[in-house]
Regions:
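Extracytoplasmic loops and strand-loop junctions of Gram-negative outer membrane beta-barrel proteins
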Residues: 54-60, 216, 265-268
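Sec/SRP-type N-terminal targeting helices
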Residues: 6-12, 25, 69, 80-107, ...
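Flexible, surface-exposed loop regions and adjacent strand-edge segments
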Residues: 49-55, 206, 271-275
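Short segments within alpha-helical structural elements
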Residues: 26, 168-193, 346-403
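Transmembrane beta-strands of outer-membrane beta-barrel pores
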Residues: 38-42, 80, 259-263, 287-289, ...
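Periplasmic alpha-helical coiled-coil/stalk elements that build and connect Gram-negative outer-membrane
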Residues: 19, 109-222, 330, 334
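Bacterial Sec-pathway N-terminal export signals of envelope proteins
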Residues: 1-37, 43, 195, 201-239, ...
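Short flexible linkers and secondary-structure junctions
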Residues: 1-116, 253, 257
Length: 408
């Protein structure tokens, strides 16, 4: 299953969620930046100053600054309190849990699909084995019918009927073999198994019969369902979102430090020979004074979303109860059908043995032998079908109870 592309995608989705959390929490760390600049005045700005020696005369033009300027600046900021970063820290655990639960929910569906595809292949293989046994029996019957025909004990009708029955069984065998190929291909697909590699499957009918039996008196606990757990996590995250909007009136406080190195000169090749550094440290505080009622509207919207999620939770709870009742009802019905088909095999086997013996004694016709053989094969195949339907129902009940394991 680890080779399944969807499983790999789920692992990537979890990884993306973890990275998003780290990105949000990174704002708690100091943010350090550097910048540099170089400037040359093609024409220097000037200031007009009165002539002290001739106050009533024209004003004097005095150049402002120098022709060449350069600066290197280092700045660092540290969030002390910020609502965005604060809520990111509070919700990080729930977002990790949400990603894990989302992945687990999808994995459960994959496991269910793999189990059902696996049992479908086993069912077809067991049916093929029954058909092969029937072919062996029919081949022997055909030889017996031919021998009786050659000896004149029976007419050609019995021989032809035996031939028809054998041909039908051979046709069923071919259909079963081709069906198995398609089902194995589908099983490989849902497993993510390379299609060109052989897939070795083992089955034990007795073990399957034992595994198929479950306690029919147990009740559902929706808290065991990963879908319900995910909804609970979503409710917590939505509540945190409402709290975020409620707290959006709080100020943002951060500390900062700046260090500047300034270079100035009228001659370019002398620019970096002398520097004039300066530095500052301080606190920055910002208050949201008025945002056009956006905060209030966001709170109302978030509360509505929370209420909707609550209703989703209630509806999902009811759906899970219905799903469990339906799955358990199907299981009980399939269990009764399976036990009935077990009895049918015993009866069909007794009928076949009796009819075969009476045919050999000349009491019964060959047609009755064919009918009893067909009934026996049908009873065995029906028993297999009932067993695998019981296994499918077993899986559905376990899924409804939240007991499907994905820890492989």
């Amino acid at each position: 299953m680890h080779n399944q592309p969807l499983v790999k995608q789920l692992n990537l989705d979890e990884g993306i969620a973890r990275q998003n959390i780290r990105i949000a929490l990174a704002d708690w760390l100091p943010q350090v930046n550097a910048s540099a600049g170089l400037q040359h005045y093609l024409k220097q700005p000037v200031f007009l100053f009165p002539d002290i020696s001739n106050p009533t005369g024209p004003k004097i033009l005095i150049p402002n600054g120098v022709l060449y300027n350069s600066n290197i600046q280092f700045s660092a900021t540290q969030n002390i309190f910020n609502n965005d970063v604060y809520i990111a820290g509070r919700t990080a655990g729930n977002y990790r849990l949400q990603a894990s639960q989302t992945s687990r929910s999808a994995l459960i569906e994959i496991v269910v699909e793999i189990n059902k595809a696996f049992y479908d292949v086993l069912l077809s293989r067991e049916q093929l084995n029954i058909i092969k046994e029937e072919i062996d029996r029919l081949s022997k019957s055909l030889k017996d019918a031919y021998a009786l025909y050659q000896s004149g004990t029976s007419d050609v009708i019995d021989y032809k009927r035996a031939t028809i029955s054998l041909n039908n069984a051979l046709s069923q065998k071919k259909n079963a073999e081709e069906s198995i190929k398609a089902k194995i291909s589908y099983l490989k697909q849902v497993m993510g198994y390379p299609n060109e590699k052989p897939l070795n499957l083992s089955s034990n009918i007795l073990s399957m019969e034992k595994d198929a039996i479950i306690d029919t008196l147990q009740n559902i606990n929706v808290y065991n369902r990963i879908e319900y757990q995910l909804l609970q996590t979503n409710l917590k995250l939505q509540k945190s979102k409402t709290d975020y909007y409620r707290m959006s009136f709080l100020p943002s406080l951060s500390a900062f430090a700046n260090y500047n190195i300034i270079y100035q000169n009228d001659v370019y090749n002398q620019l970096f020979k002398s520097s004039y550094p300066n530095s500052t440290i301080g606190l920055s505080l910002s208050f949201p004074i008025f945002e056009g009622t956006k905060r209030i509207q966001n709170i109302k919207k978030s509360k509505m979303q929370y209420e909707r999620l609550t209703l989703d939770t209630l509806n999902t709870r009811n759906e899970m109860n219905t799903q469990f009742v339906s799955a358990m009802a199907s299981y009980k019905s399939d269990l009764a059908a399976y036990r009935m088909t077990q009895q049918n095999i015993e009866i069909a086997q007794d009928v076949y043995n009796t009819v075969k013996l009476q045919y050999n004694q000349g009491i019964k016709t060959y047609l009755e032998v064919i009918v009893s053989e067909t009934d026996l094969m049908s009873a065995r195949i029906n028993n297999l079908n009932a067993l695998f339907m019981l296994m499918f129902s077993n899986i559905d009940v376990k899924r409804a109870l939240g007991e499907i394991s994905v820890d492989y």
